[in-house]
Every structure is written in C-alpha cells, then in structure tokens.
Amino acid sequence: MISWISGDLVDFWHTNQKLFILINCQGLGYEVQILESFFLKLKKDQKSNKIITLWIKHIKKEDSDLLFGFTSKDQKNFFIEILSIRGVGS
C-alpha cells in the first residue's frame, strides 16, 4: 500500500472538476488527485521540478486504482473518516 510519495512535480491539470498532479518518484510517474487549495497553490507558484511530498490514500476499485494526495496527515485522516460514513464515496 502506498502511504506517502515524495518526488519531482512533472505536471498538474484538471479534468471534469477533478484536480491532478503527476509526480516523478525515482523514474515512476504517479498520477494523484489533489485538493483544490493545493492545486491553486501550485498554479500560483508555477515552479517546475519542484519536490512534492504528499500523504496518500490508495483506493482500489474493480475497474481502477485511485491515489488521493494530501499535504498533511490530518487531511488524509479526515478524508478516511468521511469515507467511513455510509453512502459517502460509493
């Protein structure tokens, strides 16, 4: 299971109201969905080859593997708590 990722920021983009970054971690590219606040900060900074470290929640579904990235462990834990509520995230 992936718990956190640290690596070079390659790109960031949005698709269908979802925000993503691509992180190069020792030659592997990880596509991670991120919060809007972090996306806006990256957009404002506009630095390439910036080192990014994120806490990761890996969700495995029948048809996909999803990585959700957070800038703090507290954000990640809050996300996990929300997912435990019946009907949320299904």
Kindly label every feature range from the protein language model.
Residues M1-S84:
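Structure-specific DNA junction-binding interface
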